[in-house]
Amino acid sequence: MSATSSPTAFLQVATGKPAEHTPVWFMRQAGRSLPEYRAVRGEGSILDAIKQPRLAADITLQPVARYGVDAAVLYSDIVVPAHAVGFGIDVAPGTGPVAEHPFRTVADLQRLRPLDPEADTPYVLETVRMLAAELKVPLLAFAGAPFTVGSYLVEGKPSRDHLITKQMMRDEPELWNALM
């Protein structure tokens, strides 16, 4: 991709207008292959890195600087909200999201509370502020679908078959719906 690519190509296409080229961006997961990512990421969990605004901003900027992509993707993870409200979930290297105590009972509802972004995730807000001041391309963010995040909480780890989740949906639909 050319370093002269239009910073508005993504916004042009997003608003239904033609652009001089198809916009390109680099998902966070792909960023793991960048040598500069491996150099700055260091040890510790991804959540540790996300909680450091300068580091998270720098990682977000890496594909933009290297490839001149048309949008940046916020360095984050779909479990940040559950972790931020104290659920006890982390991202284990080579495994993915792992819950300390999976969500299985009505009592587990007490472990969840509404997210207050300013109180619970000030590091995300600060990262976004930094990026808004530095980026010349749009900033994209992502979120996990309720089923995906809910399944991580219920299963306690990544699952291909979601048996515990399906059992809860079938046997305890009120509990499942409350989680959703």
Short names for language-model regions:
Residues 90-180:
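Active-site-proximal, glycine-rich beta->alpha crossover segments in alpha/beta enzymes
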Residues 1-93:
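N-terminal basic, low-complexity leaders that serve as flexible interaction/assembly modules and, when applicable
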